[in-house]
C-alpha cells in the first residue's frame, strides 16, 4: 500500500520532475553518479520524507562536481528502529 505524501514531499517531487522534464534536457547529461542526482532526490524524499530526504539530496548534489569520481551511489536504506 502506498504511503501518503506530505504537502512538502508533493511539492518537492513536482519541482524535481519539472526540472527533469524542462531543464535537464536543455543542459544535457552531466551527472557523475548513478542514479542521477534528480532521481536520487526523488527516491530519498519518497523513502525518508521531506526533511531527511532533502538532506541526503543536498549532500549528493554538493558531491556532484568534476573533482569527485562519481559512480554508483544508492539512497541509504531506511532504518527501522522498532525492529532492533
UniProtKB/Swiss-Prot annotation:
Q: Which family does it belong to?
A: Belongs to the UPF0161 family.
The compartments listed are: Cell inner membrane
Q: Briefly, what is this protein's role?
A: Could be involved in insertion of integral membrane proteins into the membrane.
Its lineage reads:
Bacteria, Pseudomonadati, Pseudomonadota, Gammaproteobacteria, Alteromonadales
Superkingdom is: Bacteria
Instruction: Indicate yes or no for the key word Cell membrane.
Output: yes
Q: Which PANTHER family match?
A: MEMBRANE PROTEIN INSERTION EFFICIENCY FACTOR-RELATED
Q: What is this protein called?
A: Putative membrane protein insertion efficiency factor
InterPro entries for this protein: Membr_insert_effic_factor_YidD
Q: Which HAMAP family match?
A: UPF0161_YidD
Q: Which organism is it from?
A: Shewanella loihica (strain ATCC BAA-1088 / PV-4)
Q: Which GO terms describe its cellular component?
A: plasma membrane
How would you describe this protein's topology in the membrane?
A: Peripheral membrane protein
Pfam families recorded: YidD
Q: Which UniProt keywords apply?
A: Cell inner membrane, Cell membrane, Membrane
